[in-house]
């Protein structure tokens, strides 16, 4: 897709996987615009139009630190869930939120759908480019992606995670970030 964007001098490229419930974009400079950046673009735009319910974005614990910092800069709250679009949707429904997404590509616009929809995501990206008159590269530059390593850690006793002292330490560390 990157080569096609360059060869065709396109403003962007948008790709979908098998069942098209996810989207990935490439800007005109051939940079991949991942789901964290896409959801950042959407949250900022929706806040500007008054469409970001309760001024809040729902995402998972796997989101990049850059997304959290960008949302903080734009005074947008973040609700984090465990990994999985079903948890994102559950939190959106419980809180009455309009936008949620996860790093794997599922982005949910509750105004239009109750599941991740890659075609809808692609249309939203195009709409933001048209509405703002900015390229995808310019829109994506709102967020800096920080290096990130995701490691699956087996956990036999999940009750240890609920320990109040541990939760306090996690909250303190998150506040420092």
Regions found by a protein language model. Give the residues of each.
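Generic hydrophobic alpha-helical segments
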Residues: 1-5, 43, 88, 173
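Short glycine/threonine-rich catalytic loop with a Thr-x-Gly-x-Asp
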Residues: 16-18, 32-37, 113-116
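Short, well-ordered alpha-helical scaffold segments within catalytic/effector domains
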Residues: 2, 40, 166-170
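Short Gly/Thr/Asp-enriched flexible loops that form oxyanion-binding sites at enzyme active sites
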Residues: 21-41, 67-68
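N-terminal small/polar loop signature for handling phosphorylated ligands or for N-terminal nucleophile
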Residues: 1-26
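Anionic group-transfer/hydrolysis microenvironments
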Residues: 17-19, 29, 62, 104
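Phosphate-binding and adjacent anionic-ligand microenvironments
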Residues: 12, 49-177
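Short, acidic/small-residue loops that bind anionic groups at enzyme active sites
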Residues: 31-53, 82-84
């Amino acid at each position: 897709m990157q080569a096609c964007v360059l060869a065709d001098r396109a403003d962007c490229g948008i790709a979908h996987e098998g069942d098209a419930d996810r989207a990935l974009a490439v800007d005109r400079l051939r940079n991949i615009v991942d789901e964290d950046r896409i959801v950042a673009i959407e949250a900022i735009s929706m806040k500007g139009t008054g469409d970001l319910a309760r001024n809040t974005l729902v995402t998972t614990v796997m989101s990049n630190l850059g997304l959290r910092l960008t949302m903080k800069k734009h005074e947008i709250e973040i609700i984090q869930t465990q990994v999985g679009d079903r948890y994102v949707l559950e939190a959106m429904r419980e809180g009455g939120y309009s936008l949620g997404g996860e790093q794997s590509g599922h982005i949910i616009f509750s105004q239009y759908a109750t599941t991740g929809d890659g075609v809808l995501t692609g249309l939203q990206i195009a709409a933001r480019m048209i509405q703002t008159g900015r390229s995808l590269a310019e829109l994506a530059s709102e967020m800096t992606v920080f290096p990130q390593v995701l490691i699956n850690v087996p956990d036999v006793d999940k009750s240890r995670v609920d320990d109040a002292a541990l939760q306090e330490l996690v909250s303190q560390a998150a506040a420092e970030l």
